Structures are given as C-alpha cells and as structure tokens.
Amino acid sequence: MHTKIHLPPCILLLLLFSLPSFNVVVGGDGESGNPFTPKGYLIRYWKKQISNDLPKPWFLLNKASPLNAAQYATYTKLVADQNALTTQLHTFCSSANLMCAPDLSPSLEKHSGDIHFATYSDKNFTNYGTNEPGIGVNTFKNYSEGENIPVNSFRRYGRGSPRDNKFDNYASDGNVIDQSFNSYSTSTAGGSGKFTNYAANANDPNLHFTSYSDQGTGGVQKFTIYSQEANAGDQYFKSYGKNGNGANGEFVSYGNDTNVIGSTFTNYGQTANGGDQKFTSYGFNGNVPENHFTNYGAGGNGPSETFNSYRDQSNVGDDTFTTYVKDANGGEANFTNYGQSFNEGTDVFTTYGKGGNDPHINFKTYGVNNTFKDYVKDTATFSNYHNKTSQVLASLMEVNGGKKVNNRWVEPGKFFREKMLKSGTIMPMPDIKDKMPKRSFLPRVIASKLPFSTSKIAELKKIFHAGDESQVEKMIGDALSECERAPSAGETKRCVNSAEDMIDFATSVLGRNVVVRTTEDTKGSNGNIMIGSVKGINGGKVTKSVSCHQTLYPYLLYYCHSVPKVRVYEADILDPNSKVKINHGVAICHVDTSSWGPSHGAFVALGSGPGKIEVCHWIFENDMTWAIAD
C-alpha cells in the first residue's frame, strides 16, 4: 500500500528552484531539460517566433549555450562587471564551451642539448642547447603537433653552440595556431642546422619566426618547409642568415600550396660575408596569396645568391619584392623565376642589384602584369620578360569553348552547375566538414552585454586575454571588420551572436513561416557521389533565402545574409557504387552572379564570368540556409 503525500504548491516551486539540474519535460522528443537554462529559453523562443509546427531544427537548437541554470544566473550577473569576468575567463570559457587561448607564463627552464625531446606542447620554451660546448647533435623532434588552438613560444634554440642542430616538426597540422619562434642557431661557429617542418598543414595560423642562423660562422643551414599547405591566416619570418661569415644557407620551401595566406619575409642573408645562399621556392601554387618579401642579400660581401622561384603558378593575389642584392660588393646573383602566375595578380619588384659594386646579376624569367621599378642596367641580364600573356601562362590554361577547365586551385565539386542536380548524376563532393573549433552560442542576455565593435577591440582583448599581435586579437579584429563591412549590392547582412538574433534576422527578411536547413552530415566528402531524388524548395522557383556561415570568434558567431534570386534544393546523396543513400544534402544555386568578381573561385572552376552563368554549392557542415516554408 502506497501513501500519497500532498505538498503545497509553494513547496513544489521551492523544490524546483533549489534543484537546477532537475529535468522538466517541456514537450516533444528531444526537448527534455531544465526550462531555466539557455537551451530551454531558446526552445520557447522558437515556438513563440516561428508560426508553423514543422519539426524543430535540433542542429540549430543544440548550439545553445550548455550553461546550467545556476551558471546562467552567475555569469549573467558577472558579465555586468567585465573586470570580474576577465578574472574568471577560463572557467567561463570551459562552462560555456567557448574558444579561449591558454594563458602561458614565461618558463625559466633550461635544457641542455643532451636531452632529446620527442614531443612538447602548450608551454613557453625559453632555452634549449644554448652555449653547449663540443661536438654533438641537438635534437628536437616534435613541438605542438596536431593541436587545437595551441599557443606556444619557443625562445631560444642552440644559440652560441658549435653543435649540429636538428628540429623536425613545429606546430604542424594545428588548428587556429598562435606560434612564435624567437631564435634558432644564432651566433654559432661551425656546425650545421636543419629545420625540417614548421607549421605545415595548419588552419588559420598566426606565425612569427624572428631569427634563424643569424651571425653564424661557417657551417651549413637548411630550412626545408615553412607553412606548406596552410589555410588562411598570417605568417611572418623576420631574419634568416643575417651577418653570417662564410655560412651557407638554403631555404627550400616557404608558403607553398597555400590558400588565402598573408606572408611577410623581412630579411634573408643581409650583410653576409661570402657563403652561398639559396632560396628554392616562395609562394608556389598559392590561391589568392598576399606575399611580401622585403630584403634579400642586401649589403653582402662577395655573395653567391640564388632565388629559384617566387609566386610561380599562383592564382591572383598581390605580391611585393622590395630589394634583391642591394649594395652588394661583387659576387653573383641569379633569380630564375618571378611571378609566372596562372591567373594574374599584382606583382611589384622594387629594386634589383641597385648600389652594388660590380655584381654579376642574371634574371631569367619575369612574369606578366608586374612592375619593376629599379635595377642595375649595366650589370643585370634579363633572359625573358613577359609583357603580355606568357606561353608558360597559356600552357597552364586549357581553353575549351572559351571555358577554363583547369581548376586546381578550387576543390572539385565546391561549385557546380544547376543541371548537375538531377537524379543519377555522378559528381565530386568537396570536403564539407567544419574545420572550426567547436563552440556554442552565448545566451543573448550575456552576449548583449559584451563589446562588439572594432572601436572596442582594446576592451575585448582585455576580456579574452588577447596579447598584441596574437591569434585571438587577429581573430576578433577580422570578424568585427567583416561584420562592419558595407553589404554588397542587393545583399542584406547581419552578424548574429546568439541563436535568438539569428531567428530574428531570418524572420525579419522572410516572415515567421520559415524553415532552416543544413546538409545532414559529412558523408560523401572528398569523393564521388551520386545524386538521388531531388526536391526544389518553394517549387524550385527563384526565391530569396537567408544563408548563415560560421565566423571564427571566441563564441559562436554567424555571418547571415539574404541574397536575392536563388533556388534552393534538397537532394539525397547516394554511394555511386552501391546506390545506397549516405547523406541528405542542401544546395543553393545563385541565379544572378553579375556582382561577383571575375577571379571568383566559381569562375576559375567552371569557366565563364560574372552574370553569365548560375553557380551552385552545397551547404557545409554547421552552415545553414533559411527559406519560406512550403
């Protein structure tokens, strides 16, 4: 026999508020949770603002802040005092699922070269193998490999030591990395140095390398790979082989095969005495690179300088080379290939061999659309200068019916024509996986109290512990600048830093009877797929939609914009061999491309030009598109 206990309503309410983790069903599958959490509030807000009863978009609602009710109340109060919030930043970031870089304090550790490190990460490394005497090898194998949001500083490696120095891998395969390397093999006498791999395959890197093999005597130094196949971000290399005496240096590859990288190399082999210097490849095969090389071999005495390739086969972008072997005394300088672009960019070469004392200078190939401001006319020899479209350029472009079909800078399947969206079509699918760090929205009440303007970057740096020239500072500045950019012709845009703001923007453009869609998952990425059944949204008619794309920021931030004259489709994605459904994709086709730039990746991949063709693309993981409900 069970005894029924009757409690007054006020006692029940008291119990509810005293148990923040108490589960209360607020209706429907997947809606179980505390209604006083940010997610509970978002679910209620969706019901209030959206006028239809279609299934809820859990891929959006699950991006709500994971704060529980007690944490929500605490941080809502704390954010009113930003000084108090910044003292508890890392607890806040952990609880709210934000992206915050670690605070690294300077390390006073010193390690001799007899210690051979295999792996090392997430610390400032002050001193390795400095002033080590005698013969031997300093070996450092892996530093900060494959990390997510790593912040590392390596201050000094092998300074003043005659030993051979080897550094295998530094910050490769990292995501949103902030790395600085201060000094490598400086002031050494004899010995050889080899740095194999620095920040290869990094996504959105912020790289600073201050000094490599400066003031060395004799010896051979080799830097093999610097930031190869990196995506977005910026990199800076300040000095290589400066003030060397009879030292030989070789830099094999810098910033090759990159996508939208900003690259600055300040000084290579300045005021070196004798020795052979060789730079094999800089910025080869880049997509929209911004390359700046300030000074190569200036003030050298009897140097032998060779620069093999600069910006060869790159796609648009801008490049500057300021000085090459300026004020050199005798010696020989050879520059083999500059600016042989696939698609023309802007190339400026300021001075070559100026002020030199009887240098022997050869310049082999200089590309199209370049500006050469000053060179030594008496001693410089130009083998080949292209002032029109070059044969090399033409050989890289296959033209078929006026269409460029060489699309090696654009991933296969990233852009396609509308006619491809038919059942039975086999086509490549790009990598639609989300590469950004996982984050959640902030609750609207908290996000609204944080600064959100380029004029408030100093305050944001303080809140998020962002140092000067750090990745976090750059990330915040880039995001806010894009948010404040004037809209393109016909575009309505807004950056939304809460799910509620996204709902408000979408409904302000499309009305309250809306549906938000995304591609179901990432299956089929990087391979061939077969198109199954296809459904045109709004009857397949030209309509308008709101698309929202992630932006890199400490908390989840979306750039949402309404683009007129589009058609939106849903399509089953099949395995091309088994014909089994593996995914359900959402694609958007832009009918009017007249305002797009002629160098847009879609035209590189598909041919034609602005306003001449429609262009379609898939909605990538964690991006989404809104449309009026059918």
Swiss-Prot record:
Glycosylated position list: 124, 142, 256, 334, 369, 387
Name where it mostly resides: secreted
Reported induction = Transiently repressed by ethylene.
The UniProt entry's GO CC annotations, sorted and at most eight, read: apoplast
* Signal peptide residues on this chain, from the entry's feature table: 1-27
Give the PROSITE patterns listed for this entry.
BURP
Domain annotation BURP: ranges: 415-629
**Keyword presence, Protease:** no
This protein's assembly is summarised as: Interacts with polygalacturonase-2 (isoenzymes PG2A and PG2B) to form heterodimers called polygalacturonase-1 (PG1).
Q: What is this protein called?
A: Polygalacturonase-1 non-catalytic subunit beta
Record organism: Solanum lycopersicum
**Organism placement in taxonomy:** Eukaryota, Viridiplantae, Streptophyta, Embryophyta, Tracheophyta
